[in-house]
Amino acid sequence: MIKTDILIIGAGPTGLFAVFEAGLLKLKCHILDALPQPGGQLSELYPKKPIYDIPGFPEVLAGDLVDGLMEQIKQFEPGFTLGERAETVEKQEDGTFIVTSNKGTKFHAPVIAIAGGLGSFEPRKPLIEDIEFYEDKGVKYFIKNPEKFRDKRVVIAGGGDSALDWSIFLANVASEVTLIHRRNEFRGALDSVEKVQELKSAGKIKLITPAEVIGINGAEHVESLDIEENGAHRKIECDYFIPLFGLTPKLGPIGDWGLEIEKNAIKVNNALDYQTNIPGIFAIGDVNTYPGKLKLILCGFHEATLMCQAAYGIINPGKKYVLKYTTVSGVDGFDGTRKEAPKAVVKAIV
């Protein structure tokens, strides 16, 4: 039996940052994740993808962000159980929980924070005949190693941030990048849309809108695509076709825990602390939903911070926590290390 203050289900960026915030409150964390390594989608699906909206980082690769978070939480000595999925939860008479994994490992904690960790992401696939045949033969739903597309002809389909960001990134890798979207308007960040337009004007990206890919051709590998543009059909040659229409997460066994579910996400009380309808169980990051929800990493960091404050009250009933700033109090690691806050220097006015 693994005992901890907070059992975090999910080793993605939100779950990892929750360890840091909990550590500042002297709360011990253990992380459970179905994937074999920490990082969640960042490590599993796109470790080499640049991220542009992390405060203080004009650009950071997803994998590097994970490395930074792991370094940041090392001082708080979190436990990790990777490659196992949360299966069942049992509430105890004292209000604590026992969670059992699919491999029989048991965890005992007064607080559970669900931050993903389900290990199951289904890409939304376009309705194209025989597309399954070409999977791993030129059709890719994720980009883990951009170098695979070095000097290749790549067609990306989609209108969101992933399609825009990868088109921008691969413009300097592939020999030819074509972005296809069924509408003239994109739903990604305005800055990314403007960058794609700049690259189009510079001849580094071909933009085809409104259009859809309706067929794939090739004997053993993708050789060309059939597209429909303004009612007319034509063929474009390519080496890789990457449809980026988003991911559908699967809640798995957690969906049977009695939590309120809305559109495959866990409903939480965002006005307070991101707690679910079961006291002591929180949901943070992309796995939750509430009015005004934004699926952004930085929003997950905020949710993790408030969750830890509420968890402190559950774990230490009746004990008031006084907020301290790390710039004043420093950081005391569970491993005996201490990061000192800079001492204020006061000079007398002569």
Swiss-Prot record:
<keyword id="KW-0521">NADP</keyword>
<protein>
    <recommendedName>
        <fullName>Ferredoxin--NADP reductase</fullName>
        <ecNumber>1.18.1.2</ecNumber>
    </recommendedName>
</protein>
<dbReference type="InterPro" id="IPR022890">
    <property type="entry name" value="Fd--NADP_Rdtase_type_2"/>
</dbReference>
<feature type="binding site">
    <location>
        <position position="327"/>
    </location>
    <ligand>
        <name>FAD</name>
    </ligand>
</feature>
<dbReference type="InterPro" id="IPR050097">
    <property type="entry name" value="Ferredoxin-NADP_redctase_2"/>
</dbReference>
<comment type="subunit">
    <text>Homodimer.</text>
</comment>
<feature type="binding site">
    <location>
        <position position="41"/>
    </location>
    <ligand>
        <name>FAD</name>
    </ligand>
</feature>
<feature type="binding site">
    <location>
        <position position="33"/>
    </location>
    <ligand>
        <name>FAD</name>
    </ligand>
</feature>
<dbReference type="GO" id="GO:0050660">
    <property type="term" value="F:flavin adenine dinucleotide binding"/>
</dbReference>
<keyword id="KW-0274">FAD</keyword>
<feature type="binding site">
    <location>
        <position position="86"/>
    </location>
    <ligand>
        <name>FAD</name>
    </ligand>
</feature>
<feature type="binding site">
    <location>
        <position position="14"/>
    </location>
    <ligand>
        <name>FAD</name>
    </ligand>
</feature>
<dbReference type="GO" id="GO:0050661">
    <property type="term" value="F:NADP binding"/>
</dbReference>
<dbReference type="InterPro" id="IPR023753">
    <property type="entry name" value="FAD/NAD-binding_dom"/>
</dbReference>
<dbReference type="Pfam" id="PF07992">
    <property type="entry name" value="Pyr_redox_2"/>
</dbReference>
<feature type="binding site">
    <location>
        <position position="286"/>
    </location>
    <ligand>
        <name>FAD</name>
    </ligand>
</feature>
<comment type="similarity">
    <text>Belongs to the ferredoxin--NADP reductase type 2 family.</text>
</comment>
<dbReference type="InterPro" id="IPR036188">
    <property type="entry name" value="FAD/NAD-bd_sf"/>
</dbReference>
<keyword id="KW-0285">Flavoprotein</keyword>
<feature type="binding site">
    <location>
        <position position="46"/>
    </location>
    <ligand>
        <name>FAD</name>
    </ligand>
</feature>
<dbReference type="GO" id="GO:0004324">
    <property type="term" value="F:ferredoxin-NADP+ reductase activity"/>
</dbReference>
<keyword id="KW-0560">Oxidoreductase</keyword>
<feature type="binding site">
    <location>
        <position position="121"/>
    </location>
    <ligand>
        <name>FAD</name>
    </ligand>
</feature>
